[in-house]
Amino acid sequence: MTYARIQGVGSYIPQQILSNADLEKMVNTTDEWIMQRVGVRERHVIANSPDNTTTMAVDAAKRAIEMAGIDPAVIDMIIVGTATAEYYFPSTACLVQKHLNLREDIPAFDINAACAGFVYALSIADQYIRNEGAKHILVIGVDSLTKVVDWKDRSTCILFGDGAGAVILQAHKEPGILNTILHANGDYSDLITAKSGVWERESVPHLHMYGKEVFKLAVTKLGEIVDEIIEKSGLKQSDIDWLIPHQANLRIIEATAKRLGLPRERVILTIEQHGNTSAASIPLALDAAVRAGKIKRGDTLLLEAFGAGLAWGAALLKL
């Protein structure tokens, strides 16, 4: 049996840091209030730097390729999960292909599942390796949500940071991705929006979110999907070594960990330093944990994410 196994990870975050103390000067908020409500102390932001969605994706990809120890010429697919592409078209994936000078006989495309984008992209890549003969796939999660937040809205501007994370998936006989599950419900599409499309747009697109409703749904749906994927994989909660959640809200993360019976020290947390980086949050957290020596080859990881759409998903894998 052929598995898709993570061979290398990489990430990138902008240099500029926006702290809660900085936000206290911009909106009516406090460090104590932000930490208590969401668990964010600081976030990295593009601001006026030369960084953008494409450059961050490229830098994260380079680091993943370096860790994987592969020749970039062997990459036979690029999938980018992002909701904040630099352009309507071309895709971010094609721009990454250009900057990495990858060969042309490969598919490269973006998918938009907002904060769940990386898990969606990972699931698609897994199927291409299992069923279509792909050998090395570059999967990236990247977003620049600080470019669409309303800096006068204290309920949302405190949440988000910018960044990118990437993995190299390689076809392997040893177990890698065991299962993925993806769900969506468009009936809740108005709960998180940023209207910048062709047909309906704001002069300056801003992210709007009904936070209380999103919180309740996230706790419920993530709890259900982690139970579903563990059962589908024939495992027990005690088999999970690490939970790597989407870093959206500390209270949501704690609720999922409690449902799994996982102590806090078995949960990878970067929300305090990164904020919510949308599709980048899971690969950013994974990269940080691998490079810190926390997560090791053979560990069983549960990834889960929830975002606009509403779209949510989970992946269970052996590193």
UniProtKB/Swiss-Prot annotation:
Residues 247-251 are annotated as: ACP-binding. It comes from the Bacteria. InterPro entries: ACP_syn_III_C, ACP_syn_III_N, FabH, Thiolase-like. GO terms for biological process: fatty acid biosynthetic process. It catalyses: malonyl-[ACP] + acetyl-CoA + H(+) = 3-oxobutanoyl-[ACP] + CO2 + CoA. It is found in: Cytoplasm. Pathway: Lipid metabolism; fatty acid biosynthesis. One of its GO terms (cellular component) is cytoplasm. Its EC number is 2.3.1.180. Coiled coil: none annotated. The keyword Acyltransferase applies. The active site is at 115, 246, 276. Keywords: Acyltransferase, Cytoplasm, Fatty acid biosynthesis, Fatty acid metabolism, Lipid biosynthesis, Lipid metabolism, Multifunctional enzyme, Transferase. Transmembrane segments: none annotated. It is an enzyme of class 2 (transferase). GO terms for molecular function: 3-oxoacyl-[acyl-carrier-protein] synthase activity; beta-ketoacyl-acyl-carrier-protein synthase III activity. Homodimer. Catalyzes the condensation reaction of fatty acid synthesis by the addition to an acyl acceptor of two carbons from malonyl-ACP. Catalyzes the first condensation reaction which initiates fatty acid synthesis and may therefore play a role in governing the total rate of fatty acid production. Possesses both acetoacetyl-ACP synthase and acetyl transacylase activities. Its substrate specificity determines the biosynthesis of branched-chain and/or straight-chain of fatty acids. The last Arg residue of the ACP-binding site is essential for the weak association between ACP/AcpP and FabH. Belongs to the thiolase-like superfamily. FabH family. This is Beta-ketoacyl-[acyl-carrier-protein] synthase III.
